[in-house]
Amino acid sequence: MIFVLDVGNTNAVLGVFEEGKLCQHWRMETDRHKTEDEYGMLIKQLLEHEGLSFGDIKGIIVSSVVPPIMFALERMCEKYFKIKPLVVGPGIKTGLNIKYENPREVGADRIVNAVAGIQLYGSPLIIVDFGTATTYCYINEEKHYMGGVITPGIMISAEALYSRAAKLPRIEITKPSSIVGKNTVSAMQAGILYGYVGQVEGIVKRMKEEAKQEPTVIATGGLAKLIAEESNVIDIVDPFLTLKGLYMLYERNAILQHEKGE
């Protein structure tokens, strides 16, 4: 079994793959203050709840956009799993041709999504990942990573409205019964949801026009399904695209290491 860990700014998503299939997955809050022991005990409980143990895991890969947390996670893997994790970053073999001005600036999550998107859905592609920040990545027909767009995530937008407007409440992000709100909460829900849908459709439209292509549009991330249901530009929702990409990267690098005799 292979353990994959995708650490975002708000949440971390964990998964276990067996023979290429995602058999378990969990989501937990990203906590920069937890120690390797706290993470170890938390993951131990998650595994045991599914009848698994540290000893069942034969390999680990980690992707993180939160550098301060990596030391604790790497120590945790070595202490409890007795495995040195593969970390998405410099030195890992992705197979991607990245056309960014500085390829090192491309976030680990965006690289992982691109790897999975190309392998699962071909190219050209636009991948929209609804996280703390929403990222749009464009992969052309030659499977080159061309760049993309980064915007504040929908939760950041909602929190900004709540925190900067004294009389507006904190709300749940959900579909309202009507675009025309009949109270403050439903009016805010309509504004945040449909405003964000409009942003997605506008950015995707402009990316397609500039690329002069009709790429497949893949959505992933926590709110992908909600946005996709209200949008006419998203072709496929794959909530586990990042976890699948992590597994693919693990397999690719494990094969290369085996061929080198490492």
Swiss-Prot record:
User: Which keywords describe this protein according to UniProt?
Assistant: ATP-binding, Coenzyme A biosynthesis, Cytoplasm, Kinase, Metal-binding, Nucleotide-binding, Potassium, Transferase
Q: Does the keyword Kinase apply?
A: yes
Indicate where this protein resides in the cell. Answer: Cytoplasm
What is a single molecular function from GO for this protein? ATP binding
Positions annotated as active site in the UniProt record: 109 (proton acceptor)
Q: One GO CC annotation, please?
A: cytoplasm
The UniProt record gives the binding positions of substrate as 100, 107-110, 184
- List, alphabetically, the SUPFAM superfamilies matched: Actin-like ATPase domain
The protein in question is named Type III pantothenate kinase
Which species does this protein come from?
Bacillus cytotoxicus (strain DSM 22905 / CIP 110041 / 391-98 / NVH 391-98)
Q: The organism's lineage?
A: Bacteria, Bacillati, Bacillota, Bacilli, Bacillales
